[in-house]
Amino acid sequence: KVVMRRPISKGFFVSIDKADGNPLSAMDVARVKQRMTEVVEEKTPFHRHEVQIEEAIDVFRKLGHMDKVKLLESCGEVYISYYTLGDTADYYYDVLVPDAGYLKVWDLTPYRDGAILRVPDRHKPEQLAPFIEQPKTFDVFAETIRWNRIMGLDNVGDVNQACIDGKATDLIQVAEALQEKKIVQIAEEIFSRYKSPQKVRIVLITGPTSSGKSTFCKRLSVQLKACGLHPVSFSTDDYFVNRLDTPKLPDGSYDFDNFDTVDHAALQKDVLKLISGETVEVPEYNFVTGIREYNGKKLALEEGSILLIEGLHALNPKLLDNIPDSEKFRIFINTITSISLDDHNCIPTSDNRLLRRIVRDFNKGAFTAQETISNWPNVRRAEVKWIYPYQEDADVLFNSAYLVEFAVLRSHAERILATVPKNCPEYSEAHRLEKFLHYFVYVSDKQIPPTSLMRYFIG
């Protein structure tokens, strides 16, 4: 049994369960790779079959692909398309190339207890994307998979069925409990290091856009108080340079994600004063006027205080390069999606955040869905350049992905995505997201607690 688990290390982690139950060996991976190579060299065609969903369900039931049966039974569609490659029938929710001969740039290499399927670099498709070791990210993913298995949830079909059976509230409560448990563990680790001879003084919190940094910071503050500490916090956003001084992209638009958007010299100067015992007046950035203002907000670190700094560039080593690393505790927040549509269809990790941002931007009147989608490629490029390089430097990685997230987001996102005009370039992405959301049953947000990371995005 082959399962595409998730995107990682610029490729996809694949688990391969052998029929004899023995561990996967490098020789096993080599044999799978050889068969894949043969299929590519033979230019075996992909055939698309559009049928009524009952027919597709029957095909996959006979093949024993119950992951696909559960997904298709619960998605509510009337017609569906599936593909065949030779004698092998499978399902893919997007479009495939005409034949396997198009797949010239790839590799399959052993990794941990499975393999990594390496794919082309999206910017240089004639060569493989560079392999980037991500042990901490993989460990978070493995931990989430373990909890999913304990609850009997391998794929979206399992989650849908649980919701249909009236267990959505249970899933929400378990998801909240697991996140709170992790936050408690992080707070206790910070407290332990605060009491150590090196004495951690600063907690740095970062993550890509819409990962839940602000809400996480608030919830961590509560748990730090429960440990007996007095958290004092601010955001790097308040140290943005005035808009006229903001770096620009080649097209002349503002590069708001650039590291130099933050006045890191002023920020570091204030942090050094704070940890030296001084009282500091910190700025508040006015996003309407684009000016950093000083309105009398003062911070001070007393006995038992610990400083929390949250923002996109919080883990950039240049931000506080005059402060010893031993005094810093780094936290990276990401949405590491552990649930797949089925055994062969992963969910892109960025889809969580894009949908969160579309809903949040629209509800707050900041941007339309079309504008958010249009700007998303720039956001992703900035994350790859400025944020993700420091992910593995974190002391702790926190997964803010929510087990029933897409089911909760569906009712919010569908009406917003429907506002994207059909005659604009962003419509294809809006349509893809709408189609993707159809795989999830509706789950009401009424059971989402007010302190939930999800609540910040859905209101």
Sequence positions of predicted segments:
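Auxiliary tRNA-acceptor-end handling modules of aminoacyl-tRNA synthetases
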Residues: 2-181, 186, 191-194
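Conserved NTP phosphate-binding and transfer environment spanning the P-loop NTPase/kinase superfamily
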Residues: 194, 320-459
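Hydrophobic anchor at the beta1->P-loop junction of P-loop NTPases
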Residues: 203-205
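P-loop (Walker A) phosphate-binding loop of NTP-binding proteins
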Residues: 208
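Conserved glycine(s) of the Walker
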Residues: 212
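Hydrophobic positions on the alpha1 helix immediately C-terminal to the Walker A/P-loop
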Residues: 215-220
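Post-Walker A helix-loop "phosphate-sensing" segment adjacent to the P-loop in P-loop NTPases
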Residues: 222-232
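Conserved nucleotide-sensing/catalytic segment adjacent to the nucleotide-binding pocket
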Residues: 232-234, 241-290, 306
